Amino acid sequence: MKNRIITLLCIVCLFTGNEVCRAQMQEVISGVVRNESNEPLDGAIISVPDNPEYTTSSDKDGKFIMEIPSGASMVICKIPGYRNQTMKFTLNKPVEFCLISDIAGQDTSLEVAMLQKERKGGYTGAISTVQGEELVKTPNSGFSATLTGRLAGLTSIQSTSTPADDATTMYIRGLNSINGNSPLVVLDGIPAPLFDMNTLDANTVESVSILKDAAAKALYGPRASSGVILITTKRGEIGRTKVNVNMDFSIQQATQRPKIVSTGEYAQMRNQALLNDGGTPLYSLYEIAGFTDGTMPGHDWYDTFMNDAASMQRYNVNISGGNNRVKYLVNAGYLHQNSLIDAEKNDNYNPALKLHRFNILANVDVTLHRYLNCFLNTNVTIDRINQGYNGTGDIMNSIYQMAPTVPGPITEDGKVITAEYNEYPTYGLINRSGYSHQTGINLNVAYGMNLDLGFLTKGLSVKGIVGYEANYDGTIYGSTDYARYAANGSGLFGTHTTLPLSLSKTANMRYFINFQGFINYNRIFGGKHEVDAFV
């Protein structure tokens, strides 16, 4: 019994002694962070070089208090938009940082490949970068469209503004290959060949960079022959929990409406075209006079089937924070967009084109040990697209092709009217042909660990990353036909018949797995000479 008590006391002393030694090995310093105008800087990160376990952030008054290991003599202060500053400190004396604005961004870290970061001032490759704060200024449902005009060397062509289909075709420094000209998309250091960049929430993006020269091929191989688009999402920082809520409402309008001739002018030109072909005029002088003075009905089909404006709403909630052990950022977003095409809901379905998009992003960084840390990135996007059975291209063609002299678009009792030689009237294409419900899901998950081998030689580390990407696309179609009636001299006669809905479904799923492992060496000698290499 006596031996057991002695053993237990030894164990207790061992653990308490370890904590006492740890406490004795730590010191506490305090200070303040200001800019050139002597204004306090909130959220500045202060840490001990090469020892991320000892890190803190400044408060709204620019003040900070932090623990430091025994023997440390230097601390470094960083904040976006300012040059990094390293200072030597003395115990029991406040540390006063005065940060200088970094207009040229020389101390900005660029993520050039596989989570490897380089200081902008030291990177020699051809690269262009835009910060996420600039991208959120453009209220666009498609993320790729927000890059237009913001990155030198990036050519973007947008051929449609249809909700959920307004992505741009992008080229970096023109057309480069006969096998394909699409640049490689890299999301947080992981190549993402299946990733639909158009669905990305701009509120989650820290920066976007493009690699434009041979350096891209050296880093990513033949897949980067047309350049690389590097997307870096936001991460949590040390400090108190921050909650940001963003809401915006925007209006989408056509930049220019088509100029359409009047019904009377159309009738005259139609007759002239028939005469030029040796035919018989279609409209009498009496009808032309009626179309001209308005006694006979005429239509501007663009004005009939197109709304003046369409709305888009975006909602976003962002929660971030962290400490020396765990840093986190969680973002949830919702987007709703309507279409300019005017559709009518019926008893069986709603053919109106609408986009519902849900985005969830969660980035977590964990320091497991002084020499070991890990991260987990999760990005999920869900698109729900509801629209009529026919695409917007067919509808717009029908609007432009349908003669303004055709009555309608429906009779008083709801019958669809068309011309004798127009089998698919615009009203029927929009409201009576059926529907499609499309669901798209993008999932990107990455997990990685970094082992600092500084205890062997300063600046040496090894890292391993596994990335998983999955893409699902499924569509439910409900197709039908409908009765339509063409006007002739004696009244209306029916063509086609109304059919019940016929349902069908298509679905496909793809996935991509990426493994990365490399050794990194980064060290500064003499305060001036830097060596950075990885395999």
Where are these regions (language model features)?
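Flexible loop and strand-edge segments within Gram-negative outer membrane beta-barrel domains
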Residues: 254-256, 295-333, 337-340, 351-425, ...
